[in-house]
């Protein structure tokens, strides 16, 4: 029987199957952070249980850490309690922790790939919705709830249904200033934020094939914004090159054995997908969200859509509501929208390639005096690499604040947030109401577009600038 990549990974991890279609899957890697794990550990104590596989469990502090100080007190009492609990839990249950003093501390979905913890063919879970990021390596990865975190800690397994298969083939020629962020935002806008509900999405096509691993991670990171359980990209030579000599990657003879296995991780010819999309990105422009959902997105030269253009009454009502919240009027050009803050960071766009692309725009330039801008490297490793290349100096000289690693302004869970009615150009993954702070207004963009917004104080078309 011909199988998709998803089916191969799923089937190879089945420990037990039930007649109702549910299976118990073995989990290869369990990633933890300070927010969704405390209750799970406490429940283990109450039940007098241990962690089944401490060596397959890794933890970091990221969601509510301060990006201005390594002081555990800096983000408030609740954040302090959560971080203290993580320290206590990891020590008691013998789990490796990337705490505030660890040189490689950072965002969970950044540090795991760069350390070689994330490998093709794995089943990976984390109490965070953007665990789909790891699918870029051909790993079946998805977010789980706190009760499921407890179950994986105790058993190293998880009950899961079998999802349907979707293929999104991305074809065409990538234009000037078009990044992986623009590609995935365009796809979300094209097919909608619920198109992937009930599916695992496999991304393929010549555009995906040419992407670096960091670009692929951006694409898979936002598969969840299509409503999918996760996203996948088959591993190839680009994957192997990225993983070679990483700290936790296989070494020596094990490396060759691993590659032999990884080469089998591809969808078989004539395998059946339940739904297929072919999307040509040849003529797309840099993308900017205008509403309160990632699928409310348009090209930089476009206007906020007129409500009458929506034939679907639900989408029409959502557009009206979004415009009211975002304080935008239909017919307004994106390039006429001014902003207050710029955020470059998050598990979507805080890797070294993201920082390099933004720094090229900012070099020898100064940001608008009306804009406050911060750049937050995704990990200690990214931060050191950027500093060794002098990128920190470029950002600082342009007027950005150069911060410590963390989730930062992606979510209003730490000190980095929007004030009431502030408008932000953000490289994060969600623009929901209040996501970056109470009544804050979020526009999702690529690092290039964020850098341009900082320079001009408004959204700008890079194709029309010198």
UniProtKB/Swiss-Prot annotation:
Coiled coil: none annotated. PROSITE patterns: ACONITASE_1, ACONITASE_2. The keyword rRNA-binding does not apply. GO terms for molecular function: 3-isopropylmalate dehydratase activity; 4 iron, 4 sulfur cluster binding; metal ion binding. Pathway: Amino-acid biosynthesis; L-leucine biosynthesis; L-leucine from 3-methyl-2-oxobutanoate: step 2/4. Transmembrane segments: none annotated. [4Fe-4S] cluster binds at residues 347, 407, 410. Keywords: 4Fe-4S, Amino-acid biosynthesis, Branched-chain amino acid biosynthesis, Iron, Iron-sulfur, Leucine biosynthesis, Lyase, Metal-binding, Plasmid. GO terms for biological process: L-leucine biosynthetic process. Its cofactor is [4Fe-4S] cluster. Its EC number is 4.2.1.33. SUPFAM superfamilies: Aconitase iron-sulfur domain. It catalyses: (2R,3S)-3-isopropylmalate = (2S)-2-isopropylmalate. Binds 1 [4Fe-4S] cluster per subunit. Pfam families: Aconitase (PF00330). Belongs to the aconitase/IPM isomerase family. LeuC type 1 subfamily. Catalyzes the isomerization between 2-isopropylmalate and 3-isopropylmalate, via the formation of 2-isopropylmaleate. Heterodimer of LeuC and LeuD. This is 3-isopropylmalate dehydratase large subunit. It comes from Buchnera aphidicola subsp. Diuraphis noxia.
